[in-house]
Amino acid sequence: MMMKAAISRTGVPMPLHRSFERELAQLEAMTGRVPDNVGIDRIRRALESENNYLVAKAAGLVANHGLAGLLAQTLAAFDRFFIDPVKTDPQCWAKNALVKALVKLDCRDATVYLRGLRHTQEEPVWGGQSDTAGVLRGTCTQALVACEGLGETALLNILLEPLLDQDKAVRMEAARAIGQVGGVSAALLLKLRVLLRKEEPEVLGACFSALLGIEHGDRPGTISLVADFLDDGEEAAAEAAFSLAETHDPAALAALIERRQLGADTWFGSVLDHAIVLTRLREGMDFLLGVIERDVRQAPSALEAISRVHQSAEVRARVAESVARAKNERVTLAFRQFFPESAPGSPASHKAK
C-alpha cells in the first residue's frame, strides 16, 4: 500500500499513519447512513487514493449505497490497480471491492470483466508464491453472464477458461455461470465436466446444481446422471445427494430413497436422510417416519434429519406417533434428544407461554 503525506488545515504535512486513520474513520462513519454531498466527495477522493485498503473501503460504500455518479471513478480505480499490481494492490483488496461495486452499479462492459477474469497475481509467500486473484476471477466470471454484446456461443467459449482454472472456487463460479446461461449447449458442457470424474467434490456439487437447474428437456436423464454419483465416494456422493434434494423433484426423491434402501454407513446414511427431508416432499417425510417405526438402528438418524428441518408442533406430533409405534427405548431416547419438550414449536413450549 502506497501513501502520500496529507496536508493539514494549517499547511503542515500530517504523519502518514494519522492521515490514514483519519480518512479510514471518515469512510467507516458512512457505513450505516446515506452519504451527503460532502460524504460523496470524500468517497470520490478515496477512490483516487494510492492506498488499496482505503480504495476498497470507498468501493464498498459505492456498492452499498449504489452511488452511480461515481461509476467513472470506480472504473478508473479498477484500471489503475492492474499496474504493478503486487506492489499497488497486495491481496487484490482494491480490485475485489471495485469489481463488486461495478457489478452493483450495473456496469455491463464485458471488456472490464474479461480483464479481471484473465488476471493472475502471484505474490510471495513462505516457500514460494501464491496467486491471490482467485476471488477477482470468480466475481468477473459471474459478472460476464449479464454483459451486453455476448452471444450464447461466445459467452460459453469464454466461460471455458474459468471452468479450467487452477483455483477450485473459480471453477465453481464458472459452473454456476454456465448454468445461468442455460440451454442445451450449457447442459452438454456441464455434463462433460461431470462425466470426466476428475473434479474436486465441491466443484462437482456446483456442476450438479447448475446442470439440474437447466431446463433443456431431459430432466429425468439429468437426475439419473447425478444419482449415479451416489455410489461415487463419500464427498462426491454427498454433493450429489444435496444437489438432488435442491430440486424438490419427486424423481430426485425416488433416487435418494432407492439409494437409502440399499444401505449405507452411518455417515452417508445421515447424509441421505438429511437430503430426503430437504426435498420437503411429503413422500420423503413418510419414508423417514417409516424408518423410525421399523428400523431401530436407523431411526436416530431419521429423527435427527427431521429435527434439523422441521420443528413445528404438527411435525413433532407426527414423529411422536411413529416413535410410539416403534415401541423401542432407544428410539424414544433419540426422540427426546432431537425433539426436546422445550424446543420451539413443541406442545410444552406453547404451554409455557
Kindly give the residue locations of the regions a language model identified.
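Alpha-solenoid HEAT/Armadillo-like helical repeat scaffolds in large eukaryotic proteins
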Residues: 42-46, 73-86, 115-128, 158-166, ...
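Structural detector for internal amphipathic alpha-helices that build alpha-solenoid repeat scaffolds
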Residues: 11-35, 53-68, 88-107, 126-150, ...
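Core helices of alpha-solenoid repeat scaffolds
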Residues: 36-40, 71, 110, 114, ...
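Short stretches within intrinsically disordered, low-complexity N-terminal or propeptide regions
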Residues: 7-8, 242, 254, 284, ...
